[in-house]
Swiss-Prot record:
Catalyzes the condensation of the acetyl group of acetyl-CoA with 3-methyl-2-oxobutanoate (2-ketoisovalerate) to form 3-carboxy-3-hydroxy-4-methylpentanoate (2-isopropylmalate). HAMAP family: LeuA_type1 (MF_01025). It catalyses: 3-methyl-2-oxobutanoate + acetyl-CoA + H2O = (2S)-2-isopropylmalate + CoA + H(+). Homodimer. The lineage of its organism: Bacteria, Pseudomonadati, Pseudomonadota, Betaproteobacteria, Burkholderiales. It is found in: Cytoplasm. SUPFAM superfamilies: 2-isopropylmalate synthase LeuA, allosteric (dimerisation) domain (SSF110921), Aldolase (SSF51569). This is 2-isopropylmalate synthase. Keywords: Amino-acid biosynthesis, Branched-chain amino acid biosynthesis, Cytoplasm, Leucine biosynthesis, Manganese, Metal-binding, Transferase.
Length: 515
């Protein structure tokens, strides 16, 4: 019988550490529900001690998720661990994930602790955590660059104290597959009680080898949990990509002889949702979930595919959730058809009032474009969810005038708090003028780091999806807006980013937050 690999998703925690990828509580819940549909084993919902916003988000995810284990990260101290346990109270199944650095560099420079002090703190923290939860994971931060003898002592000690999962991260993406696999194997061989815990790998993609290293940790090292994120989202060059791990295990079962419980048909919906919420566009040639992942332009390849798909395809697009039937609804589609399509997309709308509001947005969009695609529906629901969160800034309307040879002018009307305000401004273009008009009133003083436009679907009728990245006071946030009118989408995106800057609960603790 094939061994099972546990899929531990950390999109909501480590993925959120990408600059600008901060998510609201409701956004985290929406992604968590999709991860549950994906049948992820463990969902790391955040770092409870890092901010009040993260604490509330973890609590909301814990209450919403029924089947997956919900996990919170914590530093290896009583205060953080207590905070994690409190946030997870509503979870059907919960895990506390405590981490502590074990490499010589981190111990000396960051922790300023001796190896013996680190060993004792690791033991105390796991002993304390076991009083609050039965499922405890310990991560040796920067584990791959740790000294083998010392790491063996730490791991043996925390297993004795009750750690049920041992995670050995390649925190800085320094490892190579064979060496990392051998490193895990050596640890498991030398730690006397290694059979008392599940071994886990957590790799970063700084050298482009996160997926390969993780698979080597499983195949060579004997690990049985892989920590990963949707789209490989994560700080610096990202994390291990969940979709690549899952499809590698499935496609090369002959080699790995392992299974996972993931419903692969939910991979693309998860990818699209994470991309839309965070504003991080998936590159077209990204494995499994990129727009070109199953595209064949070579005439020879196309001929082979038509004769037999196995000539150039090692997996089916539909197996990972790509749908050949793109056009789903139109202007004449009714409320029941809209509701049914939401269910097919895995989107849950609990209140009738929320469904009615979303359907009103759908009909308004259908008046502007003749064909409504799944991506349009996802964007509609994102706008609806944002409105439900009680935004401080909310777009109402805009008008703009531009003429060749003259500076464009724009007038934007939006809600700020409980007041409706309007402002006019000029700019180098209609988008610049609109954002200047908003800033005339908002006076945020934020620095704009990025402005990008992406067509949600094909054709000139497509909605534009705009991402605006702002920075202020050391915080970086992304705002996303969608509309057939690119100028309106830009204004929505800017206001979305301002909402995140305005929310004090989103300010994170200035501390190392990743194994």
């Amino acid at each position: 019988m094939s061994d099972k690999v546990i899929i531990f998703d950390t999109t909501l925690r480590d993925g959120e550490q990408s600059p600008g990828a901060s998510m609201t509580k409701d956004e985290k819940v929406r992604i968590a529900r999709q991860l549950e549909r994906l049948k992820v084993d463990v969902i790391e919902a955040g770092f409870a001690a890092s901010s009040e916003g993260d604490f509330q988000a973890i609590s909301a995810v814990a209450a919403a998720v029924k089947d997956s284990i919900v996990c919170s990260l914590a530093r290896a101290n009583d205060k953080d661990i207590t905070r994690a346990a409190d946030a997870l109270q509503a979870a059907n199944a919960k895990r506390i994930h405590a981490f502590l650095a074990t490499s010589p560099l981190h111990m000396a420079v960051k922790l300023r602790m001796s190896p013996e002090e680190v060993l004792e703190q690791a033991k105390r923290s796991i002993r304390f955590a076991r009083n609050l939860a039965s499922d405890i994971e310990f991560s040796a931060e920067d584990g791959y660059r740790s000294e083998m003898d010392f790491l063996c002592r730490v791991v043996e000690a925390v297993i004795n104290e009750g750690a049920s999962t041992i995670n050995i991260p390649d925190t800085v993406g320094y490892a190579t597959p064979e060496l990392y696999g051998d490193f895990i194997k050596t640890l498991r061989t030398r730690v006397p009680n290694s059979d008392k815990a599940v071994w886990s790998v957590h790799c970063h993609n700084d050298l482009g080898m996160a997926v390969a290293n993780s698979l080597a940790g499983v195949k060579i090292g004997g690990a049985r949990q892989i920590e990963c994120t949707i789209n490989g989202l994560g700080e610096r060059a990202g994390n291990t990509a969940l979709e690549e791990i899952v499809m590698a295990l499935r496609t090369r079962k002959d080699y790995f002889d392992m299974v996972c419980g993931i419903d692969a048909s939910q991979i693309v919906p998860a990818s699209k949702l994470v991309s839309q919420i965070t504003g991080f566009v998936v590159q077209p040639n990204k494995a499994v979930v990129g727009a070109n992942a199953f595209a064949h332009t070579s005439g020879i390849h196309q001929d082979g595919i038509l004769k037999n798909r196995d000539t150039y395809e090692i997996m089916r697009a539909e197996d990972v959730g790509w749908s050949a039937n793109k056009i789903v609804l139109g202007k004449l589609s009714g409320r029941n058809a809209f509701k049914q399509r939401l269910q097919e997309l895995g989107i849950t709308v609990e209140a009738e009032a929320d469904l009615n509001e979303a359907f009103t947005r759908f009909k308004a969009l259908a008046d502007q474009k003749s064909e409504i695609f799944d991506e349009d529906i996802i964007a509609i629901m994102s706008d609806s969810a944002a409105a439900e969160e009680g935004e401080h800034y909310h777009f109402i309307s805009l008008s703009q005038h531009s003429e060749t040879g003259e500076r464009p002018k724009s007038r934007v009307i939006f809600r700020m708090g409980d007041k409706e305000v309007s402002s006019e401004a000029e700019g180098n273009g209609p988008v610049d003028a609109s954002l200047n008009a908003i800033e005339e009133i908002a006076k945020s003083g934020a620095e704009q780091l990025l402005y990008s436009v992406n067509a949600i679907t094909s054709g000139t009728q497509s909605q534009g999806e705009v991402t605006v990245r702002l920075s202020k006071g050391g915080r970086i946030v992304n705002g996303v807006g969608t509309d057939p009118d690119i100028i309106a989408a830009s204004a929505k995106a800017y206001l979305s980013a301002l909402n995140k800057l305005h929310d004090p609960s989103q300010a994170k603790l200035n501390a190392q937050m990743a194994p």
